[in-house]
């Protein structure tokens, strides 16, 4: 028999991943004082400032490229590479800011879901629904986190491979960096080179962990909400008991269901408040980033093609997973109205003893007919249809860019 899943196991891995960039454990209580919050987030603040400088340095470098102050034979390709890297860093910066700014909301959501997870009245059927929903999500978020770590490792250590290859072929060391960032000093001089290289390597880790940490937190929270919606639908369908001739137990279940449904609506509103703006930026930028990657894949050599393809796949996986879990909330909230109607309230003695029982179901049915939809800044519903729209937009941008360049 499979061991029951513990609540802390659902967030445990991603909490440890986020601690790599100094983010306090999302499973820990929210600090009550400003001093304690600042102390627990000191490492995260340092990482945020490091990534902020990387964005600043890359923007300056793009400006130098476009003004012709940097010598290169392929200006368009270099600018595309820089824009892709800078865009990804800006998204990571926005997600890190969102995690920090909304830490109180995150703590409240996790505490609320923990109480519901450990509720004593859950049956074996309820626990089966609970574990069956969350186990795949934990596995998916783990794979997504590892995939992003592999991607950033490829970016971080590709220059090392190129330098070794150049040494073997030409007999000379040519100092390279993972990313092209402007510094107000000679970054290739002596020991400074190694310090700058380490700075860029860790900055790559910061942006990857910031991105995937935000995404995984979103997926886990939405999966918890989807699971609660599945439980609610199951309770609604089993609400009416045939043996309950006076309808006492059925009425108690109905009142519990109404309160539970209201709690889930508040949870959905908290998720919307926490993720809406950042996901709008993410979806908007991803269309441009995927366009850039498609262009670079068609123009780059074999070595760079592998790197750009890996980057492209990570972006695709990220957007698909976000939209998939948004779709899950839409689908499970839509089933509530059908569950209320299928509870057989009209065939039982409950409706005969208490004619108002059926009328009390009307608000649940009406609310269920307005499904919960998470949106990216009230512009994009977070659904599979939006994922398809982003792909179509990216392809349109790519074909336009190819036409202009040729």
Curated annotation (Swiss-Prot):
Paired cysteines (S-S): none
Q: Which GO terms describe its cellular component?
A: plasma membrane
Where is this gene product found? Answer: Membrane
Tell me the GO BP annotations in alphabetical order.
signal transduction
Matching entries from InterPro entries are given as: 7tm6_olfct_rcpt (IPR004117)
Name the Pfam families on file. Answer: 7tm_6
Leftover remarks: Expressed at much higher levels in mosquito strains that preferentially bite human compared to 'ancestral' strains that prefer to bite non-human animals.
* Alphabetical list of PANTHER family matching this protein: ODORANT RECEPTOR, ODORANT RECEPTOR 13A-RELATED
Query: What is stated as this protein's family in its record?
Result: Belongs to the heteromeric odorant receptor channel (TC 1.A.69) family.
Q: What is this protein called?
A: Odorant receptor 4
Gene from which this protein is expressed: GPROR4
């Amino acid at each position: 028999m499979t061991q029951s899943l513990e609540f802390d196991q659902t967030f445990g891995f991603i909490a440890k991943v986020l601690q790599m960039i100094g983010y306090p454990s999302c499973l820990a209580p929210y600090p009550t004082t400003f001093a304690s919050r600042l102390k627990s987030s000191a490492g995260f603040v340092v990482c945020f400032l490091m990534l902020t400088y990387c964005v600043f340095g890359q923007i300056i470098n793009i400006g130098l490229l476009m003004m012709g102050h940097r010598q290169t034979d392929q200006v368009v390709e270099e600018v595309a590479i820089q824009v892709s890297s800078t865009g990804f860093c800006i998204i990571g910066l926005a997600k890190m800011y969102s995690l920090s700014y909304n830490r109180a909301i995150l703590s409240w959501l996790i505490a609320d879901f923990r109480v519901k997870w450990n509720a004593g009245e859950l049956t074996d059927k309820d626990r089966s629904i609970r574990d069956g929903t969350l186990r795949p999500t934990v596995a998916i978020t783990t794979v997504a986190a590892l995939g992003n770590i592999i991607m950033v490792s490829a970016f971080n250590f590709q220059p090392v491979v190129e330098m070794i290859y150049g040494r073997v072929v030409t007999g000379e060391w040519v100092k390279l960096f993972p990313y092209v960032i402007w510094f107000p000093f000679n970054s290739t001089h002596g020991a400074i080179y190694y310090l700058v290289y380490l700075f860029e390597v860790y900055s790559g880790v910061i942006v990857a962990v910031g991105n995937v940490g935000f995404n995984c937190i979103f997926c886990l929270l939405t999966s918890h909400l989807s699971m609660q919606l599945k439980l609610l639908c199951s309770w609604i369908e089993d609400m009416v008991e045939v043996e309950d001739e006076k309808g006492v137990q059925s009425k108690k279940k109905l009142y519990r269901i109404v309160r539970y449904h209201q709690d889930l609506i508040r949870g959905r509103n908290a998720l919307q408040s926490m993720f809406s703006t950042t996901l709008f930026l993410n979806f908007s930028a991803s269309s441009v980033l995927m366009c850039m990657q498609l262009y670079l894949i068609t123009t780059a050599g074999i070595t760079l093609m592998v790197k750009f393809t890996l980057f492209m796949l990570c972006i695709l996986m990220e957007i698909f997973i976000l939209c998939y879990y948004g779709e899950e909330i839409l689908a499970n909230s839509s089933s509530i109205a059908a569950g209320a109607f299928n509870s057989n309230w009209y065939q039982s003695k409950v409706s005969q003893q208490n004619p108002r029982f059926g009328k009390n179901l009307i608000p649940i049915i009406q609310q269920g007919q307005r499904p919960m939809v998470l949106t990216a800044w009230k512009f994009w519903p977070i659904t599979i249809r939006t994922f398809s729209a982003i792909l179509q937009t990216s392809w349109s941008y790519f074909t336009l860019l190819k036409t202009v360049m040729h």
